[in-house]
Structure formats: C-alpha cells, structure tokens
Swiss-Prot record:
Gene designation: surE
Annotated function: Nucleotidase that shows phosphatase activity on nucleoside 5'-monophosphates.
Disulfide bonds listed in the record: none
Entry's Gene Ontology cellular component terms: cytoplasm
GO molecular function, one term: exopolyphosphatase activity
Pfam families recorded: SurE (PF01975)
InterPro entries for the chain: SurE, SurE-like_Pase/nucleotidase, SurE-like_sf
Subcellular locations according to the entry: Cytoplasm
Protein name: 5'-nucleotidase SurE
Domain of life of the source: Bacteria
Reported cofactor(s): a divalent metal cation
Reactions that this protein is recorded to catalyse: a ribonucleoside 5'-phosphate + H2O = a ribonucleoside + phosphate
Enzyme Commission number(s) from the entry: 3.1.3.5
Binding site for a divalent metal cation: D8, D9, S40, N93
C-alpha cells in the first residue's frame, strides 16, 4: 500500500514525523509531501496566483511552497503520478481539530483534498493542554493511530467521506477508549481580536481564542465531549455540505 503523508504545520513539524511512524506501521511505501512553511488555519485554499516551488529534502520527502491542498495535489498528481497513493494521511496536527476547527483547518483540508481525488483519507490531530503545549503527548497518537487506520480501512470508507481523528491530551494508558462522534459546536465567543501597537504606534491585530469560552460543557456524542472525557474521537465528515433537510422549505420559499 502506497501512503501519502502531509500536514499544515510544515515539513519540519514534530507531528509530521509521528504521522510517518503511523504510516510505516501499515506500509513501507510511505511518501511525505508537506508545506515548506506553517500553513495552520489556511483551510482548503489552493494556490492559483503564485507558483509552487518543490524541494526534495530527503528520500521520498518533499517540501512545497504552498498549502496542504497544493501538497496533496502535487504528491498525488505529480510526484506519484505514475503510481498514485492508496491512502492519504494528514497530520499529526499539534492541537485538536474539532467543532468549528473543521472549517479553518489546513490539516482537515489536506485529507479532504485526498477525498476529492477519490482516495481514502484521514485527518489526525493530537490535543494538548496548557501544561503540555510545548510537549504534546505524541505517544497517544502513535499508540492508537495504526489500529484505528487498519480497522476503518478494513471496514471501508464511503465515497466523499473523510475520517477526522482526534487524540485526547493524556498519556496512552489514560485513554478510556474510542468513540465515533459527530462534529461539535463551541460557544460563539471563542474567537477574540487582540489589538496591539507597533514601534510607530500603528495598530495591528492578532486573532486568538478565549479559553474560558471554549471550556463550556459540550453536548454528548460530540468530538468535544469525547476529548474532554479522555476518549479518542473518530468523526466521519462529508465532502457534500448540502443541507438536504432544508431544501424543500427553501424551494417553497422561492416559488
């Protein structure tokens, strides 16, 4: 089995080495194509107005001056064009990708691009806490990742579906199990705008997160709840975002 690995944290990110280890537990035919620079939060952006620069950094390891989406396209269509991958793994992201993160995440976008190309694809993310921010518990992803991939691949993944896996911020021995979840929802106040001043007293801004707003009790059955309760969260996400339940009412309103 040929596996293509990517991420959004960049070619030198620790989590990329972890996802490669997970991939090598399944196959010896592993290729890495990742962004030259950190692309966190770029979502599913595609580089149309800038050229892509490709750099070989080692055997079967390539850096692309572009987004995770660009990397998957370059990997599947150019680098591995004569023999495309059988599986795409995106991650392991430093930090969880749950709830509204799904919309912003370059990690999930890398997996979604694999799904668009008709390839089984997983997004993998390792949650961290305030205490473990500088040293996330990567061993949790290493421990549970390979077995989850094997079982899901054996069961088969429907078309236009990407599997979003989030590992809780605890040691492997403290994980209570695995849950299949749905996408959660945070308090609407979780984003903040932080205004600062530069040396010339001109304003500039950072978008950040209000941790207190993110600590609300999440709904049962969600990715947020699973992580809080120390379970691995496995969420099947659909590429098709059509709200079919609203289609009939929408049609009636437009008559």
């Amino acid at each position: 089995m040929r596996i293509l690995c990517t991420n959004d944290d960049g070619i030198h990110a620790p989590g990329l080495k972890v996802v490669e280890e997970i991939a090598r537990a399944l196959s010896d035919d592993v290729w890495v194509v990742a962004p030259e620079l950190d692309q966190s939060g770029v979502s599913h952006s595609l580089s149309l107005n800038d050229p892509l620069r490709l750099r070989e950094v080692g055997p079967r390891h390539f850096a692309v001056r572009g987004t995770p989406t660009d990397c998957v396209i370059m990997g599947a269509r150019h680098i591995l064009g004569t023999k495309p991958p059988d599986l795409v793994l995106s991650g392991v992201n430093k930090g969880r990708n749950v709830a509204e993160d799904v919309v912003y995440s370059g990690t999930i976008a890398g997996a979604l691009e694999g799904t668009i190309l008709g390839l089984p694809s997983f997004a993998l993310s390792q949650e961290f806490s305030v205490e473990t921010r500088e040293r996330p518990p990567w061993d949790t992803a290493r421990t549970f990742g390979p077995d989850i991939l094997r079982k899901v691949m054996a069961a088969g993944i429907p078309k236009e579906t990407v599997i979003n896996v989030n590992f809780p911020s605890c040691a492997p021995e403290d994980v209570l199990g695995i849950r299949v979840t749905r996408q959660g929802k945070r308090n609407l106040g979780f984003l903040r705008i932080d205004e600062r001043r530069d040396g010339r007293n001109n304003p500039y801004f950072w978008i950040g997160f209000e941790r207190a707003a993110m600590m609300d009790t999440p709904a049962e059955g969600t990715d947020l709840a699973a992580l809080r309760e120390r379970y691995v969260s496995v969420t099947p996400l659909r590429l098709d975002r059509t709200n079919e339940a609203f289609s009939e009412a929408l049609g009636a309103a437009l008559k």
